[in-house]
Amino acid sequence: MVKFYSGNYSVRQKSANADKCICYAEHHFNSADPSANYALAVVAANASLTSINWGMWYAQAAASLLGTKVFSPSSTWPGVALGGIDGRGNENLLYTDMPAILLEPLFVSNPKQAAQLKQATWQDALAKTLADSIRKFFPDGGLVAFSIGHKGKTSNPTDCGAAIHGGGHECEYAEIVLKKAATLLEK
């Protein structure tokens, strides 16, 4: 079973804790230079080893799917940004009691990746990658928490994240992918 959480990020996390969710996935897409092309998962500075391993697996699977690189931090966990990138993303997960990752599988500023994201087949593939990662790391099942990055914050209700090359916004496509992943997990 999957439940979507909204509100400010700390409220989402605390609500998922109260609901005893088994895991928490917040979906974003990255934006930077148009040539940027790596997949990554952010985990909080206080992340469990399960969060780190889940994030590493997800980032590697997303990179393989998209034919891109894996984020290579100066750590022992390829694909994982422990504590976020310069702290960005850490607060999005810091208050969870369960394993939690923030997904950044591609760059919406990269024209090729933005075009892929707009195609249903790529959305389906990203959703399957996320669903597969959850089934792999949480085989006993339970309530899964999904958070659509940027969307639904009470502190900034119009925030929809980065503009996508060629039109659209990050939160629109994060929501599409998460809804497709939820459908897969609830089968």
Language-model features, listed with the residues they occupy:
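Active-site-proximal helix/loop segments of hydrolytic enzymes
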Residues: 1-187
